[in-house]
């Protein structure tokens, strides 16, 4: 046997065993995996897997030399184990020319990338998605000669969006220029995205913006699309001359020139990561309609300027540094990825009109603006070394956005809202096991895209807030400043920088290790529960703090209070300690412990029974407001979730929240409303749990509404308005008679003179729905002209009308809508928009009636016995029946859903009120 054959066999055998081992653990990576145009589909059995792998490896072994076998085997291993590109090839500079064919929704690209190769190779891998590559040329200058090599083969790894370019010769270490010619698409999954808008004179126009997803740039040009890789960019954009397009970029626009049929724009950037690039193209005559920040006249312009000035002052930046190009674009698919010196808002997210929008919208818009502006601090600053580290930058931007809005607009109480709306929601989602840990592996495209979800924007800032309060303001701010001066950074870099600042400014004998403290908080799906035990004697009280798991280090800095006075110095309950014990002198007054001051720690607190009773007694005293408002909210949220997880008896939860009848602050009420949402699934059922829940909650809502009133006044505090809206919503959901009477009164008042007695927009749906529930007002009275149905713009209004409990009125409107629908089809064929609007509202109406009345005997009877006459033709019989079943909670009513004839017959049987079997019979 000659040496070449022996090497082939050895390589073949070892590679086969190696790939088979990987196959068992990484099957999904082989889906549609392409090498040299050979397709490997996902096998179904072990034998099939072995045969197909054998086939591909035999081909590699039979057609390659020793070096190329080794090269290909390395390539396979990299693809299986690591989604990253090889680290021995790096881009230094990109020169890109893009020519848009806007009528055909395509663009042509030429990309010249200056790269450095540090290790001999025969192929180059880079990212590319939805691009049709037509030519690849690699050049290298050696002395006076330019060596040119064309790619002999191009392979795609679709799951990783990687293109592999194979060359005839081995590429030695050195500097190269990689030139690629390609074609892309202007579409939602393309390099450019088209967004429609209506300009000032009513014309429909198109705005074109670069794909705003984290990995959207690989759809615009082939590139090394990893966050830790930075390069300079020179981008030339050619747009049709006759389209009057204007180009804005997040970088320096050197100049533009016109040479029919194109207008050319030249853009350069400093060293940045690919995901920070942004380009917006639109008709220059519609500049103000696209809402650039300098032309905004609504409140948001002032807010953005105020937020920007505050951030610049806090971070000691030159005035005007952050107030650059900021655009609010209607319909923009915004995933929250920040661009360099370029803020793209989704206009719907930040528009606020005080005449039609509830105050909660203004607060939420403020939060988004704050995060976007602070995100600009990371323009040319530190980039994460890998996608899994992106949560750090996003968490910092979100948290400091909250801090900035809280400082700029203190009346928004943005920090208080952050705790109850963001941090507590994060704890709830952790309970549900629906969030991955912050520090998660990223091995696929879907995992990269999923990173930019609510996990980053609720858990990341919550964990960083805990670190902030553990190390203190000065250390936290200085540590972040130092970290941002780095070019790229990993989590270890961040912990190292923060530790360095902490050590230099802290004199404590028992210093904390920042990395050890924080690692488990970002690596685990859940959070710890801190158990608090008090042991009393005649003069002293012993306090024992412990966690169920020994793995957690729980920061308790400034978190332990007795009688609202801090009793413990800075310390952590470390993983080495089973418990922490301290003692305090008994006072004559009521004693109670508050752990986790202002809920700065990301954990729940479980007190023993006597401690719960002491806290409850104090909350039910006239001094309840002495407990910090965030701790009042924390106690409610903790007790509810301990109760539903069977760690606490529910009667304790109701004892704790019994004080709410005196509480007029929206913040502690917020977790109570969230608890009501969680328990709402039991409301349709007529059982003991449902009755107790309704009774207990109404016992708090009744006195509250008597205290704050049912009517909204213009001079009411923002949070009183929010509290009243939620309190009345839940009071009516729970069938409170006073709530329904007030709604009927407001509805009749409005209908007496709709022009003069106008309802506030955010009360309109509530008033109509709850007013119609109890009034004798007929729906025919509301629609004297049924053509008005086609002019209803918001589906929510159809939902409100479906609240009517008058059986005759509902049936009458159904009949008239059915007739009018047929009239529309025959009479309005030229007015398609009007007809479509009517049919759409009719469909909404049908579904909303089912949702509201499927459990009502009389209306359910009408639905079932007039099914074909009532059902819109656009809804299938199957879909309609399933919808009725989904909203029917009575076994008796379900049994009545027995026979509906369309093209098929449906026989539905209910077994033990739990199992539903549907037989389809022709």
Where are these regions (language model features)?
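Hydrophobic helix-coil surface modules that form long, contiguous segments used
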Residues: 109, 212-215, 222-370, 399, ...
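Hydrophobic alpha-helical and helix-loop surface patches within well-folded domains
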Residues: 133, 266, 299-548, 678, ...
């Amino acid at each position: 046997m000659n040496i070449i054959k022996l090497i082939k066999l050895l390589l073949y055998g070892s590679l086969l065993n190696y790939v088979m081992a990987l196959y068992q653990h990484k099957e999904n990576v082989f889906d549609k995996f392409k090498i040299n145009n050979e397709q490997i589909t996902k096998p179904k059995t072990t034998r099939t897997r072995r045969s197909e792998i054998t086939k591909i490896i035999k081909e590699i072994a039979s057609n390659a030399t020793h070096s190329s076998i080794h090269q290909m085997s390395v390539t396979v291993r990299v693809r299986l184990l690591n989604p990253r590109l090889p680290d021995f090839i790096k881009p230094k500079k990109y020169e890109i020319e893009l020519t848009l064919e806007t009528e055909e929704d395509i663009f042509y690209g030429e990309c010249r990338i200056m790269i450095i190769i540090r290790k001999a190779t025969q192929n180059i891998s880079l990212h590319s998605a939805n691009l049709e590559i037509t030519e690849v040329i690699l050049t290298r200058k050696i002395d006076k000669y330019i060596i040119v090599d064309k790619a002999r083969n191009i392979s795609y790894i679709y799951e990783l969006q990687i293109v592999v370019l194979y060359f005839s010769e081995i590429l030695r270490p050195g500097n190269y220029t990689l030139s690629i010619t390609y074609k892309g698409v202007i579409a939602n999954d393309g390099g450019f995205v088209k967004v429609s808008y209506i300009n000032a004179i009513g014309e429909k126009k198109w705005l074109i913006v670069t794909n705003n997803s984290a990995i959207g740039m690989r759809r615009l040009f082939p590139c090394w699309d990893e966050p830790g890789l930075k390069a300079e960019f020179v981008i030339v954009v050619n747009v049709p001359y006759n389209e009057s397009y204007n180009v804005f970029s997040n970088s320096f626009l050197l100049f533009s020139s016109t040479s029919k049929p194109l207008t050319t724009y030249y853009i350069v950037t400093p060293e940045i990561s690919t995901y920070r690039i942004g380009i917006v193209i639109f008709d220059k005559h519609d500049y103000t309609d696209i809402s650039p920040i300098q032309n905004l006249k609504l409140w948001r312009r002032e807010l953005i300027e105020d937020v920007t000035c505050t951030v610049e002052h806090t971070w000691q930046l030159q005035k005007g540094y952050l107030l650059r190009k900021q655009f609010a674009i209607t319909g923009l698919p915004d995933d929250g990825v920040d661009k360099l010196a370029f803020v793209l808002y989704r206009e719907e997210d930040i528009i606020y009109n005080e005449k039609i929008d509830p105050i909660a919208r203004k607060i939420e818009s403020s939060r988004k603006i704050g995060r976007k502006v602070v995100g600009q601090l990371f323009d040319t600053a530190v980039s994460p070394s890998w996608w899994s580290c992106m949560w750090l930058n996003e968490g910092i931007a979100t948290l400091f956005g909250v801090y900035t809005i809280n400082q700029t607009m203190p009346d928004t109480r943005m920090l208080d809202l952050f705790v109850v709306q963001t941090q507590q929601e994060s704890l709830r989602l952790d309970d549900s096991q629906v969030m991955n840990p912050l520090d998660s592996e990223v091995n696929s495209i879907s995992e990269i895209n999923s990173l930019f979800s609510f996990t980053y924007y609720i858990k990341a800032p919550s964990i960083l807030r805990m670190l902030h309060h553990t190390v203190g303001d000065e250390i936290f701010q200085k540590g972040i400043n130092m970290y941002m001066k780095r070019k790229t950074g990993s989590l270890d870099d961040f912990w190292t920088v923060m530790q360095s600042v902490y050590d230099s400014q802290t004199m404590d004998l028992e210093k904390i290790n920042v990395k050890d403290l924080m690692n488990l908080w970002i690596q685990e799906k859940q959070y710890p529960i801190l158990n608090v035990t008090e042991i009393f004697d005649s003069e002293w009280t012993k306090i024992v703090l412990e966690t169920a798991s020994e793995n957690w280090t729980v920061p308790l800095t400034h978190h332990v209070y007795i009688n609202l006075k801090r009793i413990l110095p800075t310390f952590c309950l470390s993983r080495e300690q089973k418990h922490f014990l301290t003692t305090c002198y008994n006072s004559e007054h009521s004693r109670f412990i508050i752990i986790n001051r202002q809920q700065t720690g990301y954990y729940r607190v479980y007190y023993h029974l006597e401690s719960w009773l002491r806290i409850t007694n104090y909350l039910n005293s006239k001094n309840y407001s002495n407990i910090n408002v965030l701790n009042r909210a924390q106690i409610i949220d903790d007790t509810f979730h301990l109760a539903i997880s069977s760690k606490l008896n529910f009667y304790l939860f109701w004892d704790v929240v019994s004080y709410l009848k005196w509480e007029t602050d929206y913040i502690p009420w917020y977790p109570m409303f969230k608890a009501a949402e969680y328990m709402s699934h039991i409301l349709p059922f007529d059982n003991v749990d449902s009755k107790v829940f309704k009774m207990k909650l109404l016992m708090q809502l009744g006195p509250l509404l008597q205290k704050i009133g049912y009517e909204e006044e213009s001079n009411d505090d923002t949070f009183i308005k929010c509290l009243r809206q939620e309190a009345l919503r839940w009071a009516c959901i729970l069938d409170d008679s006073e709530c329904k009477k007030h709604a009927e009164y407001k509805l009749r008042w409005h209908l007496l003179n709709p022009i003069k007695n106008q309802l506030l927009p955010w009360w309109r749906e509530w008033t109509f729905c709850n007013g119609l529930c109890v009034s004798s007002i007929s729906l025919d009275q509301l629609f004297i002209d049924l053509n008005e149905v086609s002019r209803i713009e918001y589906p929510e209004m159809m939902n409100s009308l479906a609240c009517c409990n008058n059986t005759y009125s509902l049936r009458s409107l159904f009949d008239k809508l059915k007739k009018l629908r047929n009239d529309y089809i025959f009479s309005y064929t030229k007015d398609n928009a009007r007809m479509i609007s009517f049919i759409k509202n009719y469909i909404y109406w049908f579904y909303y009636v089912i949702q509201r009345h499927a459990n009502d005997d009389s209306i359910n009877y009408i639905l079932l016995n007039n099914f074909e006459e009532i059902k819109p033709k656009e809804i299938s019989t199957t879909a309609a029946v399933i919808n009725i079943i989904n909203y029917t909670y009575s076994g008796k009513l379900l049994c009545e859903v027995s026979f509906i004839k369309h093209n098929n017959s449906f026989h539905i049987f209910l077994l033990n009120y739990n199992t539903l079997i549907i037989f389809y019979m022709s």
